[in-house]
Amino acid sequence: MFSLQKKALQHIYMTPEDASDLTNDLLQHLGLYWNGPIIKMDTVVHLHNKMFSNQSVLKYALAKQANIKILETLVLWVEPEYALAQALKHNRKDVIECIFSHHLTTPSYHHIMHLTSSQELFEFFHLFICKSKNYHARMECLLYAATLYNFQNILEKNREYIVRHSIGNALFAIACKERHIHLIAWFATAGVFDTYDDSTLFNTAFRLGDYSLLEVACDLPITYPDHLIISMMQTAIQKNYFRFFKKLLTHFNVYRPIIITDAAYYNRRKILLLLFNQNIFNNFTILCALSAAIKGHASKKTLNLLINRLDAQMTVIDSVYYSIVKYNNIDCIPLLRHLKTFRIETLLSIAIHNNNIDIITACKAFLSKDKLYYLVLKMAIISRNDKLFKLYTEQENPMYIFTTMKTIISDLISHTVFQALAIECLREFHQEKQLPIASLLMVLAEHNYITKFKKACYAANMSDQKVKQALIKCLFIAAQKNCCQIFKYCFGSLLKVLSKHERNKFFNAVVFARKLASYDDHQEMIHLIDSLIKGFRYLIKD
């Protein structure tokens, strides 16, 4: 059979404290139709072998719109906070008045204000719970609470007060934090700001990761400066908020090179694809982005995306090379080789200048041994990097290094300062490795380093047949190069050590040297040789 008792129990599910007598009349007013003994037991009521909490009885009474007299009794059985919360939920102003009449000193109940949906009751309740006696303090407290709990009509009613006391910005910040979308829109259009900070709503949207807040900010009838939109785009890139970035890009249609550079640096490939679809960035901007991607150690996919967007003939800018070296990004080198204008020699030179051994080693895979050693030794000499020079010469065949350095010295002929450095470096290397003196003499003769040539001759064993042959070769070199001092010194040195039999052969060599000088029309050298030959004939006759 249908049981009113069971039906009533379905509505009883909360809990209270403090009990008083219940009567049959009271229960009938509440809609509970039981007969039998009623026993009070602390926080519960015992009716006909059934237990009911005081809180559940109060809640049921409010739900059934019970008489105020009954409710006046029931609110005394429970804690004031619970009674107030239930009264707010059911929008019972009379019950709230009753509760406060019994509890003149109450703690702050701001945290339960939001339980009511009535503006009038919200304001009425605030009158009781606000402790301040100052009117302005009470008003600001009410407006902060109204903003916190999304009571727009209260704010609208007090708009003039908000403007007059310049609290619009502070209230707006609360609305943003609580994500009250409609309230935010009202603030932005109601003209209540003292000085509106355009970034407040955007910053809050990013801080909370709330896309709906960003949409509100974009749709507000406000003209934002471009620098703010760019800044927000950069924030979206940093946080990897693709939806945020897309919304800003499509809504405001603002583009700057810094956007693509940041996207490359933070390895945001989806954002890069979105930007490339706009077809507005030139090759130079993409190269700058590539440099940023290298700096940020972006993935190979991101690097390939940037490289594939470049014109194959576009000259690679220095910042790309410097980024590879500075940030030691070895992985990008094979990818950049696909660019026709990428110069591994340039990269190697910068790596040597910055003493980046890792990049230098990585370049080995893309250069022949001769080319690698030529570039490394040349830059090591020019930059006076003794450590690098020793690193690449200690384990290698000394004669191979000597030959490579000869080529370097010849190529530096138009750079006398650097050539002098290379000559000195070669001389020290030759001395350290104790190589045959003949090879050094010929290099010094070829480049007309007379002082170093003389020093080398002093250190040489002039009676050694190989040294004599080297000096004769130096004669020929000097004749061809028009190095008169070298020729004269070699001539005099050989006369001192040659036997009579050797002098006859030497005379023929001098005559041949004159022919070499005449081929290039070195008149000064020809006159010098003629004068030497004239005196030499007398020596032979003797």
Curated annotation (Swiss-Prot):
Induction: Expressed in the early phase of the viral replicative cycle.
Cytoplasm keyword on record: no
Alphabetized UniProt keyword annotations: Early protein
Keyword Lyase: no
Family label: Belongs to the asfivirus MGF 505 family.
Function: Plays a role in virus cell tropism, and may be required for efficient virus replication in macrophages.
Name used for this protein in its record: Protein MGF 505-11L
Organism this protein belongs to: African swine fever virus (isolate Pig/Kenya/KEN-50/1950) (ASFV)
